Amino acid sequence: MPYIFYDTETSGLETAFDQILQFAAIKTDDDLNEVDNFNVRVRLLPHVVPSPQALLVNRVAPKLLTDQTLPTHYEAICEIRNKLLEWSPAIVIGYNSIGFDEELLRQAFFQTLHPAYLTNTEGNKRSDVLPMVYATCAYEPNTLSVPINEKGNPSFRLDQIAPANGYNFINAHEAMADVRATIYMA
C-alpha cells in the first residue's frame, strides 16, 4: 500500500477557527520512493484573522494571503480532496498530524461540504510519525539523536530532530519541506 505524507501550514493553532494556508503532499511507494507530489497555497477566507505568530513561523507575508491568483479556500480544498482520492487507497501520514493537521483537514472538508473522514475511509488508513519517533526513542534509545531545547528538555520538533539526525533541513515550516523531512524521519 502506498503512503501519502502530508503537511499543512495554517493561519493559527485553533483547528475550529483557523484555516489551511498551504497543503503539501508526497505519494511514495512501499520503499518511500517518491511517486508523485502536490502543493497548493490557499487564499485567506475573508472572515479568518490570521495569528501574527503563525505568519512569522510560516514566513507568510500578509500580502500573499489575499493574492487573487491563489485558489479560493473552496477551490483548494476541492483540489486537495481530488488528489487524495486519486492517490487512494493509501496510508495517510504526517508529523504530529493526528491532533492538528488532521483536524484542520477534516474541518476544511466539512466547511466545503465534503465528507470529512477521507483519510480513514475510501480504503485509506492514517498514521503519525511523531509517536513512531517517541516509540523508537523509548525502545531503542540510541537509534535517534534527540536534541535538547533551551529548557534542557528533549525536543521532538521536526525542525530540530530531523537536522539532529542528519537531514539537511532548509526552509522549515514550509509545507513541502516539512513533508520531505517527515519522510526522512519515517
Protein language model regions, located:
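Extreme N-terminal starter segment of soluble prokaryotic enzymes
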Residues: 1-4
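Short acidic, Gly/Ser-rich segments with clustered Asp/Glu that frequently serve as metal-coordination loops
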Residues: 9-16
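Short, basic/hydrophobic alpha-helical segments
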Residues: 73-87
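Metal-dependent phosphoesterase signature
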Residues: 58-77
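Metal-dependent phosphoesterase core characteristic of DEDDh/y 3'-5' exonuclease domains
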Residues: 18-23, 27-60, 83-186
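N-terminal phosphate-binding or glycine-rich loops at protein starts, especially the Walker A/P-loop
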Residues: 6-9, 25
